[in-house]
Structure formats: C-alpha cells, structure tokens
Amino acid sequence: MLLCDSCNKGWHIYCLSPPLKHIPLGNWYCLECLNTDEETFGFVPGKCLLLEDFKRIADRAKRKWFGSGTVSRTQIEKKFWEIVEGSGGEVEVMYGNDLDTSVYGSGFPRIGDQRPESVEADIWDEYCGSPWNLNNMPKLKGSMLQAIRHNINGVTVPWLYLGMLFSSFCWHFEDHCFYSVNYLHWGEAKCWYGIPGSAASAFEKVMRKTLPDLFDAQPDLLFQLVTMLSPTVLQENKVPVYTVLQEPGNFVITFPKSFHAGFNFGLNCAEAVNFATADWLPYGGSGAELYRLYRKPSVISHEELLCVVAKGNCCNNEGSIHLKKELLRIYSKEKTWREQLWKSGILRSSPMFVPECADSVGIEEDPTCIICQQFLHLSAIVCNCRPSVFACLEHWKHLCECEPTKLRLEYRYTLAELDMMVQEVEKFGGCKTQETKISQRPSSGTKRSIALNKKEGMQVSQARPADKWLLRASKVLDAAFSSVEYATLLKESEQFLWAGSEMDRVRDVTKSLNKAKIWAEAVSDCLSKVEGEVNDDSMKVHLEFIDELLRVNPVPCFNSGYLKLKDYAEEARKLSEKIDSALSSSPTITQLELLHSEVSRSPISLKKHEILSKKISSAKMLAKRAKRYLTDAKPPGIEMDALFKLNSEMLELHVQLPETEGILDLVKKSESARDKSNKVLTGSLSLENVEELLHEFDSFSINVPELNILRQYHVDTLSWISRFNDVMVDVREGKDQRKLISDLSSLLRDGASLGIQVEGLPLVEVELKKASCREKARTVYTARKSLDFIEQLLSEAVILHIEEEEIFVEISGILSTARCWEERASTILENETQMYELKDLVRMSVNIDAVLPTLQGIENTISSAETWLQKSEPFLSATSSMASSPCSMLELPVLKDLVTQAKLLNVQLQEPRILETLLLNCERWQCDNHQLLQETEDLLDNAKIDDGTHSNILPKIMDLITRVDSARRSGLALGLNFDELPKLRTASLKLGWCCKTITLSSSSPTSELLEDVGKPSLQHIQQHLKEGQTLEILPEEYYLGKRLMELKDTGLEWAKRARKVVTDSGALALEDVFELISEGENLPVHAEQELQSLRARSMLHCICLKPYNSRSMVSCSQCGEWYHTYCLKLHWRPKAYVCSACCPLAETTPQIDPARATEPERPSLNQRRTRMVATDAAVNDLKWKTRKHIKRTTKRSPQVHILPWFFT
C-alpha cells in the first residue's frame, strides 16, 4: 500500500493510473490532492473573460515585463527560458486554450455560417470548401478520421487558442499520435520547438533523467502537458530540437509522435485541429498501447477505427499496406489472448451487441475496461456477479474473484471474420505480403473432420473436442426434438464459435441447432395454445404464423405435434373461405352475426375476423342513424350533405337494411327542393314567386342550402318593407333631418343589398337627397361656408324644387351681401391706401356669415405692415436719440432688409423714408472709414526709423490716431453694429504700439547712457513684444518690429556670453572680461544686473587667482580675503584661519589638531542633498558677510548673481 502524504489514504501501486513498479522516494500525493492543491504546478482554470478584457490583461502583462519600449524576440525568448529555469522570477499569465469553435465560432468560413454582405458568394463558397479550411481537413478523402461519426472537439472540430506574452504549451504529442495542423489568424508570433518522432524515445529518457522525482511519482507526466524543459538541455543530451517561428497566416503541421512545445510572443489567436492519413495507422496503434500502459482513457477506439476503415474500403493501394499491418497486429493479439483464455477455462462466449451505425466510429456504444480504461470493441470479459462491469482480455484476472468457468467472453467478430477482413483489404489493395499469406485460413467449405496431423498447438487441442461435439450434434438432429439436449449442445458450442475458419463447421451446425430449436419450440407453443381453448382473441395464434411454420421444408427436426397443428390450420382456412363468401354477397345483419359467433369459437385467430366485426358494427351504426332520420318526430336540422353521405355509405356497405328505401325517398325530395330553388335564384326574384316556393316546402325537415337562402331573402324583404313604411311617416311629418338622413341612408343601403326587388327604393333615394340638402343649409349658420358652396347649395335646392323654403331664401340674402363686400375689397387692394380703410373692411366682414376670399389678403396686408413697423422700431428709436449703447447695437444687414421690404408694402407710411436716410448715412460712414483703415495699414507697412527720422513719423501717427478715434465715435453714434468698429479699435491700438516701439528703438547712445539713462531694458522690450503678439502683430512683418527684434537679439546674445563667462571658474582672461564689460556698457539696451555679475567675475581670490565659485572656501580672520580649502590642502574648514600674507612668519599651514587630522565621515544622503541645494542657492545671494577690515587695503567681494534667462 502507498499512503498519500496529504490525505493519508492508501492505494495499491498496481491499481494506480498508471500503475507504479515500486514505492517512490520522498513525498507522494494522490491525484485527488494534486487536483485540489492551489499551489501545484501546471495550469489552473481561469475565469470567463470577454476578448476586450483579455486584450487589456495581455497588454498589461507585456508592459510589466518590458515596459512600453520595443523589445526583440530574442530578448523575449531568453527571458522566457530564464523564467522556466527559475532565474527570471515568477510569472502568471492567462491562456485561452481549447475553445470549442462550434460554440465560439471559427476563423474559417463554414457552410452553416451567415455570409457577410461584403463578401461575394463565389469567394465565400470557395473558402468554405477549401481543403486548407481546418473545418474540412479532418474529413478529407484519405483521412482516417472521416470514419468518425460524432464530432470530437479538438480532433475533428477545431479548437481556438487565445494567447498572451509567455503563455505556453508544454512538451507533448497529440492524442493517439495524430497529425495536427495549427493556423495563426492574427497577433504576435508563436515560437515552436519540435522533436522528430524518431527521437521520441531519446527525448523521454532525457526527461526522466533530468526530472527523476517527478516521473517516479507520476509516470504519466508527459500526458499532463505541464512539463517544460529547455531545448538547450535536450541538445546537450544529443536530442535534436528544431525551432519554427509562426507568423500570422502561417500553417504549422506536427507529425505523429513528434513531441512539441512553445510559447507566444504576445497577444494572438490561433486555430488547430487533428487529421490522420493512412501512414498514421502504426503510430495510432502505438498510441493506443501507451494509453493502455498508463491506463488513460482514449479519445476513440483504435480497433473500431481500423474495422470501419477496412469495411468501408476507403484506403488506396499505399494506405492498404499500413491498414493490413495494423489489422494483422490486432488479429494476432486477439487470437493469442482468446486462446489463452480458453486454456484458462473460460469456455462461455457470446456475440456483442452490434450498434445501429456499424459503418462509422462512435464514442458511446462500446464499454471500457475497468482496469486500463480502454474501449472494448473487439472483445471483453464479463461475469454474472457484476454484469455491468467489463475487463479487457489482458486484465481479466482483475475483474472479480469468481472462477474462470463463470466468466464469459463477449466478442464482436470471430477470428474467421477478422481474418476475412484482412483478406478483403489485401484484395482491395492489390498486393500481398508475407504476413497476409501466413494469416490465411482454410475456407468454411472443408469437411466436418479436421485434419489433425496438419495442426499444432491450440488448434489441435480445440479440434478434438470440436469433432466430438459435431458427432453428438448430428445424432441429436436425427433424433426427436429434446429441448434439454439442444440447450446443452448450444451452450457447449460457445467455446468454439469465436475461433477461426477451422471452426466454420461448428458454427454451421450451431446455426442449424438454433434454427431447429426455435422451429420446434414454436410448433409446440402453437399446439398448446390451440388445444388449450383460449377465449381471449389477443392470446390466440394467428393463422399466418402457423402457415409460416408449416411452410418450412424440409422440417429442421422431428416434432410429433406437427401433423396435429396442420389439421387445425386446415379447419381455420375453411372458416376463412366462408367469411369471404359471406362478404362478397349482400347478407343481412343477422346472417353476419351468426358467422361472427362461429369465428369467435375457433381456437385460431383469423385476420378476416376483424373485418367481419367492423362490417357488423358499421351496419348497426348506419341503421341507427337512418331510423333517426325516418322517425315520425322528424327532428329539424338534418343537413343535406349528411343525408347524401348516409345514403352512399349504406349502398357501399353491401348489407341488407330495412331503412334503405326510406332514406332514398328523402334524398329524392331534397334534390327536388334544390333544383326548384336554383331555378328561382337564377331568374328575376319577386316576392310572390319566393312565397309560393316556400309554401310548397314548408314542412320539409332537410336543410337544403338553396332553400334556406330563399327563406332568408323572404325574411329580410318583409323586414325592409316594415321599416320603409315607418320612415315615410317621419318624412311626411318633417321630423329631425339629421335622424331622417341616417334612417334613409340605412334604408337605401339595405334595400340595395336585398335579394328580392322592392318598389319603394327610388322614393327613398329622392327623399334622402332632399333631407341632405336641408341639413347642408343648416350648417351655413353653424359654420361659415365658402361662396361657391352656398351657390352650389342653392342650385341643388332648385333642382329638388325646395328653393322657396324659408331657409334657402335667407341663404340667398347672405350671398348677395358677400358679393358687394368682395367688390369693394378688390378695389382697395388694387391701389395703396391708408391703414384705417383696411381695418374698416375687416370690421365689416364680421357681420357676414360666409367665407370671404379677399379677407385673407386684407388681413395679410395689415399684418405685414404692423410686423414691418415692429421690426423698424429699434432703428427709428436710434434715429431719434442719436445714441446707442454697445449692448443694443443694431445690424446693418437688417436695416437694408427693412428698407427693401418697405417697398413691397401696399400701405401708405412715413417710416420707410426715415430708414432710407439712416441707411445712406451708414454707407457714407463705411466708405470714409475704409480709406482711413487703408491709410493706417500703409503707414505701418512703410514706416522706417533712422537717426532723426522718428521726429517726422511720430506726428503723423498721432494725427492718424486722433482721426481713427473720431471715426470710431461717429460710428458708435449711428447706433449700428458695424464690422469696421473692431477694426478701428485694433488700428488705434496698433498705432499706439508703434509709437511706443519708436520710443524704445530710437534711443541713441549719448553721454547720458553712461549712467544708463534713456536705455530700454530687455524686460521692457520683451513685454512690449508680448503686447504686440496680443494685438496679433508679427514683428517680422513691419519694419519697426524688425528693428525692435534686432535690439532684443543683440541684448540676449550679449547676456548669454556674460552668463557663460560668470560661470567659467576663471577660464577667460581678465582682459577679455573687461572687454566684455565695456561691450555691455555700450549696448543700446539696459543690462545692469549682468554688468554687476561680470564686475564681480573680474574680482580674483585665493592663491590660485580664480574668481568666486561654489566650492568650499575659508576667510582670513585678519584681512578678510577668501581662500579655497582645497588650495590650502585643508580637509575641513577651521573655525579661525590666518593667511600667509597676514602672518608671513608662520608656517604655510596652520597647526592642526592630530585628533582631527582625519577626514570626517561621509554624510547621509539627505544631508548631502540639503548641502547641494544650499550650495546652488548660495550662488544667487551669497554675500561676503564674514570679511573684516584689516590694515592692508582690500576690497569687499560684491554680491554675485546668476544671469537671468530671457528666453520666452
């Protein structure tokens, strides 16, 4: 027993999957604990992600390892193997592998997929049927996988793979050693490492040698896809390794039993599937044996695949060679094990269940071995103690503890059938091999005696009992039937049936025994039922079954009941002929019932018995229905079709019924009623004719459709006449016209749809027109109508002779008043008129009850004039006040539109002339200001400054500024929002800027400039240029700006040189420094701060005669001079120091305390940073505060400044 070091459960080492040969060293964990351990190596199921989320995680992983810069693939590959070998740190990535394309979709088009509109149908069909389409490749002609009936994910149905950086697939080969093809759709490349199939054994040896502990604990480690080993290690151990870099659009094919591994350089998407050509078959057999060895469940049954391919003849000549070799291998293996089981005492056998689709490979029918987990297609061992558990022939001893005699061999093919399968493949392939020649067996046509002198081994030992069995079987077949002896012989024959063609005679005799046993038992069973007087018809024996038994010739065996059964069958046939005779004539119900009673007493079931029963039942049912039709009560509602159907059924039944004559009379009367009704319907229907026919068939109970139509016509006509009389009374009494119209309309509509002609219909139509005309006249008072409507209404009244009625006389007066108003309105609209006249016409129209056509034009004219006055009000107000605030500026285009619209008004007004005057003033102002703006632009473009010329330009500019401001004020006074107002303001500001530019750029160096009086500073120049940028003035476009830019560039260039000299630590000679100072003093711009820094630079210090810098210095306590500590060779700054000039007799260096002669400790990082910041800041504001006055004359060091930057 092997104990798990986690759960402490015990396991037999031979029961493990795969079994272990010995107890492994170190800790060992069972499969359950390995699957539940969260920190185990390998792959862990991840969560479900959307593609966008997966992309985001992939990008984040790549940035984590290599940042956002570019990285070569060589660097990525190196880092990957460093991580694998443990020196590159830990990495956790996600790999979307084994995604079923039937669920998530394929990257290749499929026939069932919806075609995008952008792809043409021909191209789509071409790619759907392409052999390089991975959905088609497994089932192509020549592929062994086309024999598989079901779709197997990853084998016959492609899988999708979504990878990211460092996601990998470990060393493995495909299931069943299949070929595989992988296509990269998009993304980063995929790196492959491959081992040739010929070096697979060497590869496994190196893996076991390198990782002995893992393989001792898990011998099937390479099946788990969790082991990665560097190609370098494999190559060092003489294992050939090849590398392939797969780019998008590339196919990669792996060969059978070829170990391969790899990883992804980044986010990508690939698709892969398996396929198997005929040369794969030997590798497939090797793979199946590996599954058996390691007790791993296989994907398909390799033996079933071979049999299906062999029976289907789907291999060519070259493929048949590989197929024959594999069939011979499984034949030899099956033959050896079956013979060993026979020797071990397993004599019972039975054929396996044959599936419905035996011509294709399935995955659900075959059982699996309880030990090695393999499909049991060819044979299996089973025991009655556990009938649902099976074992293969190799592991039969582990099935149960029962004796071998209680076990049973189940087989799908006999050895003879397998041998025939090999010969068929050989015949189809067209070639023979030495192996197939050896495998051939004698045909089944050999004599019963087997030549024992030509047999050896197992065949000899099995042939002797077979001969004995055949001898016994011959005697039993010649004797009378005995169920016990037959069962014994059949049970004993099971030990021979699975064998080869040498047992064909046994199989033939067994079939004869089975046939005889089935026939004899059937005869005995039938005879027992016939003689047992069974009353239940369902338990009787059918005559057809007895005839089938009696037709067997010759009889398989002797049975004493055969002749008795023959006599019973003869009596049943005579009774059947009697039934035929009765049915062919026209019997009565009584005769049929007597015959039915005789048939029911027969011990044999006749098929015509049921026909006779149905005949009697139908006759009784028809007679019952006929009596109901012919009863004295004569119930109404009998349909004519039902009567005709009953008559037809009674005639077709061929049974004599007393009700037949009565039904026939009803049928004749119905036909007569139908013919007369049709004759009336086809002619001109009058009320008298219809009433005459209905009176004739008043008491007829059959529903004749045509007669029913006439009855309905008659009822509808009588109802309409009654309504007509009532409405005519209302017409004469002059009731409500609206209700009268409704009643007359309904009456007219119903009368037109009557099937019978009525006389009052024209009168209804005339009265309806009159009522409608009166109702229209009434609406003139409720809602105004047009003059055309009123004229038409009066015309209708004249036609209907009702024009003298009071309402139509009043309407005629309204029409005359409206005509007079229209004539006056037309006259006014033809000429311009005053507003009050138009409004008088509108007031008059209120009292006229009609729609006046010209009224809308009058109202539109008034509305247009009022709208124009409302829009003009702001301009009229601005004209009167002669001022407007900026927030209420009016637009000039609006004014122009108003002046144009005024010309279209058909009203006499004073306001349009006022707006025309205002528009003329505005256009004159625009013309004047256009010239002023052009003059300003010319002055700015052409102004030049020379020595003494600025005195001539400035007055012109000032005069122009005055004129521009005056024009702007006059434009504001007009109260309109002119486009020129902002331009005038900008021109004024630009002219002011030019004045200031002339002032800054025209200062000439005079004697006053020695004291920096009159010079502009660089800050002032830059500020002024920024103000010009705000005004959108580009200095390079104007001469004045160019001159100012030159001054700025000159000052900045000198300041840059000065800054460089100040910080050069004394590199520049003093003469050059003084020359630079002189140059700066003569600059046309003010640079005092830079000059002070240069003057400070000209001060030299220390014995090195260098200017001040940021390095450590010490001051003399007497003269105040500064010295560099490194020039004095001091390791630290003393509290007090006296220089050699002040103390010439002293030593060069002061006495230093020996205890402090060592260099102090290095300060901390924070202290050093603080000192550096302080040192930089000291450059700007250091002052020689520690200098002291001494006897000899010295100068204090001025404050030192860093030159400022003036770059914008």
Swiss-Prot record:
Its cofactor is Fe(2+). Residues 126-292 form the JmjC domain. The gene is JMJ17. A motif (Nuclear localization signal) lies at residues 613-620. It is found in: Nucleus. One of its GO terms (biological process) is response to abscisic acid. Fe cation binds at residues 172, 174, 260. It catalyses: N(6),N(6),N(6)-trimethyl-L-lysyl(4)-[histone H3] + 2-oxoglutarate + O2 = N(6),N(6)-dimethyl-L-lysyl(4)-[histone H3] + formaldehyde + succinate + CO2; N(6),N(6)-dimethyl-L-lysyl(4)-[histone H3] + 2-oxoglutarate + O2 = N(6)-methyl-L-lysyl(4)-[histone H3] + formaldehyde + succinate + CO2; N(6)-methyl-L-lysyl(4)-[histone H3] + 2-oxoglutarate + O2 = L-lysyl(4)-[histone H3] + formaldehyde + succinate + CO2; N(6),N(6),N(6)-trimethyl-L-lysyl(4)-[histone H3] + 3 2-oxoglutarate + 3 O2 = L-lysyl(4)-[histone H3] + 3 formaldehyde + 3 succinate + 3 CO2. Zn(2+) 3 binds at residues 383, 385, 400, 402. The lineage of its organism: Eukaryota, Viridiplantae, Streptophyta, Embryophyta, Tracheophyta. This is Lysine-specific demethylase JMJ17.
